[in-house]
């Protein structure tokens, strides 16, 4: 996270860290005792999930480790672009109980509105020019923008005219998610609305906001998978 501050230790009980070997490479969000929602591009062979973590170096007493029991992707018949359906549900190998630093974040009850102030967080890079990673998660407030603001700066991607992605950032630059924040939550007006998906490099440039998978559009799929209907289809 660029341009943010260390998160309050009590404000991110739902935030999980995805590790492969000993490297923290993505974030995710605990949505109930057994399920984590993250980005599809965070899929790796040997994922370890740390819950209830704040500092990488000083563990919380209630920190927990899990591994995926099952992973589900939102597959569509369309060609799978990086920015399309960047969502993955992970079922944990055993449930976690709520504790001082662990509690799920509920799914959104209404769609987000452009102009909302949103909070995002993660252990990703805190410098857009240097590979500086923090020991603690950083949090930042950014604005929910019109989707076109994410489409216009990237003509080379030939992005579709409408999309199940949200666009969020600060037009003057300086605040953004960055490498290592993928899969983490975007929380707008207290509701879990987005999953960090992609952005430009270097991060936090003016007029180069980032894209977040729109959780609200995938609610039916999420609820179906959790209910055991594993051949649930994705929104078109």
UniProtKB/Swiss-Prot annotation:
EC number: 3.4.21.-
S-S pairs: 7-139, 26-42, 74-234, 118-188, 150-167, 178-203
Swiss-Prot/TrEMBL keywords: Disulfide bond, Hemostasis impairing toxin, Hydrolase, Protease, Secreted, Serine protease, Toxin
Secreted recorded as keyword: yes
Alphabetical list of SMART domains matching this protein: Tryp_SPc
Tissue specificity statement from the Swiss-Prot or TrEMBL entry: Expressed by the venom gland.
GO biological process: proteolysis
Gene Ontology MF terms: serine-type endopeptidase activity; toxin activity
Record InterPro entries: Peptidase_S1_PA, Peptidase_S1_PA_chymotrypsin, Peptidase_S1A, Trypsin_dom, TRYPSIN_HIS, TRYPSIN_SER
A GO CC term assigned to this protein in UniProt: extracellular region
Record-annotated active site: 41 (charge relay system), 86 (charge relay system), 182 (charge relay system)
Chief localisation class: secreted
Protein localization: Secreted
Role of this protein: Snake venom serine protease that may act in the hemostasis system of the prey.
Family: Belongs to the peptidase S1 family. Snake venom subfamily.
Protein name: Snake venom serine protease pallase
Annotated organism of origin: Gloydius halys
């Amino acid at each position: 996270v660029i341009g943010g501050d260390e998160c309050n230790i009590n404000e991110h009980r739902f935030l999980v860290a995805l590790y492969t070997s000993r490297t923290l490479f993505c974030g995710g969000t605990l949505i109930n005792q057994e399920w984590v929602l993250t980005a599809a591009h965070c899929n790796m062979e040997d994922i370890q999930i740390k819950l209830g973590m704040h500092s990488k170096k000083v563990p919380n007493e209630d920190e927990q480790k899990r591994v995926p029991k099952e992973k589900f992707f939102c597959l569509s018949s369309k060609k799978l672009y990086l920015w399309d359906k960047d969502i993955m549900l992970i079922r944990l190998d055993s449930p976690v109980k709520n504790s001082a630093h662990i509690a799920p974040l509920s799914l959104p009850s209404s769609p987000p509105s452009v102009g909302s102030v949103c909070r995002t967080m993660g252990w990703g890079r805190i410098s857009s020019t240097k590979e500086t990673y923090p020991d603690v998660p950083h949090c930042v407030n950014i604005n929910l923008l019109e989707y076109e603001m994410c489409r216009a700066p990237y003509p080379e991607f030939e992005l579709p005219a409408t999309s199940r992605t949200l666009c969020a950032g600060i037009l003057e630059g300086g605040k953004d998610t960055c490498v290592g924040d993928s899969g983490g939550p975007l929380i707008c007006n207290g509701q879990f609305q987005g999953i960090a998906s992609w952005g430009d490099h270097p991060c936090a440039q003016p007029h180069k906001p980032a894209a977040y998978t729109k959780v609200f559009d995938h609610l039916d799929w999420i609820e179906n998978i959790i209910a055991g209907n594993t051949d649930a289809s994705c929104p078109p």
